[in-house]
């Protein structure tokens, strides 16, 4: 995902937001708090399992998947949260996927999208998300804080995504409780787990860290387990012949 590509996505999002209606705020779906769960379950590397039909880097991944069944399989096998892609243009997702999955599982759901406006946050909450994604690279620090504060005031938790030390420092200044490190390089589109390992020395006590992207095997998970509370895994689970077995391989015992 080059910066040019990120810019294309954000231009598309701006067009979508312009046409988007401001929804009335509906009651927040009840489930456990992700940060609290991570705090109380640090003896295991937790898996955030993603429902993703396609991506710009890989193209179609699994277009025929029964999204609700996939999500329920994740839940049954101990996923801590389900991440749902809702971007239609670049990831072939849909807000309805979030709504359907959130109505059929009891664990938290994450709205995985490029959020740049309060209207998107309300839509996510109304569709059943209890956590949203905010990407440091997509927002000014001032705008990031505005959206973070707005989401938390609505009772949502926020996964703040970073890619390098400068962005990690922004997340720390923000006071983010749950911080993601995306292993995808925004300028080359390459992925490297070393990104997560290199940032680990800068992690702070009292926060919870999630490694995202390029995590496929138990070996990958073992490499990250000493530093992270959880991992976000999409493609490996969407392509797995045995989803339950793959999740178990990724749930590294840290005890």
From Swiss-Prot:
> What does the record list as GO biological process?
L-tryptophan biosynthetic process
The record's annotation in Pfam families points to: IGPS (PF00218)
- For the keyword Iron, the answer is no
Q: Tell me the protein's name.
A: Indole-3-glycerol phosphate synthase
Tell me the keywords, alphabetical order.
Amino-acid biosynthesis, Aromatic amino acid biosynthesis, Decarboxylase, Lyase, Tryptophan biosynthesis
Q: Pathway it belongs to?
A: Amino-acid biosynthesis; L-tryptophan biosynthesis; L-tryptophan from chorismate: step 4/5
Q: Name one GO molecular function term.
A: phosphoribosylanthranilate isomerase activity
Q: Which InterPro entries match?
A: Aldolase_TIM (IPR013785), Indole-3-glycerol_P_synth (IPR045186), Indole-3-glycerol_P_synth_dom (IPR013798), Indole-3-GlycerolPSynthase_CS (IPR001468), RibuloseP-bd_barrel (IPR011060)
Q: Which domain of life is it from?
A: Bacteria
PROSITE patterns of this UniProt entry?
IGPS (PS00614)
Q: Does the keyword Acyltransferase apply?
A: no
Tell me its family.
Answer: Belongs to the TrpC family.
Q: What is the lineage of its organism?
A: Bacteria, Bacillati, Bacillota, Bacilli, Lactobacillales
